[in-house]
């Protein structure tokens, strides 16, 4: 369902270790926003919601709300450093298009 590259795994594990408290998992979500209509979001969660889809991906516990699940199926998450900046990149084979800034999709 979800692939997480070694670079993204290392960045996520570093964030979890630096959280200062136990976390239930990494929440992946799709939210309204951006110039193409939808954008990705991530957060460390202290608890999981009763309706969360819980996925073990590359040794990480990933929490996905039911509405975001359809958009995230097949996504690959990477962590890159380039001239444009450092951060997570989502490669979604199901996205129909994106925006010029690369921050949102439809």
UniProtKB/Swiss-Prot annotation:
Lineage, highest ranks first: Bacteria, Pseudomonadati, Pseudomonadota, Alphaproteobacteria, Rhodobacterales
Domain of life: Bacteria
Family under the similarity heading: Belongs to the HesB/IscA family.
Record PANTHER family: IRON-SULFUR CLUSTER ASSEMBLY 2 HOMOLOG, MITOCHONDRIAL
GO molecular function, a single term: iron ion binding
Listed name of the protein: Uncharacterized protein in nifU 5'region
Coiled-coil positions: none
GO biological process, one term: iron-sulfur cluster assembly
């Amino acid at each position: 369902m979800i692939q997480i590259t070694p670079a993204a795994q290392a960045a996520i594990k570093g964030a979890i270790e630096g959280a200062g408290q136990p976390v239930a998992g990494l929440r992946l979500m799709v939210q309204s926003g951006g110039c193409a209509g939808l954008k990705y979001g991530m957060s460390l969660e202290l608890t999981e919601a009763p309706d969360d889809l819980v996925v073990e991906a590359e040794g990480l516990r990933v929490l996905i709300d039911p509405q975001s699940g359809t958009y995230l199926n097949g996504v690959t998450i990477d962590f890159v450093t380039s001239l444009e900046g450092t951060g997570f990149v989502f490669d979604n084979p199901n996205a129909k298009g994106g925006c010029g800034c690369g921050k949102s999709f439809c």
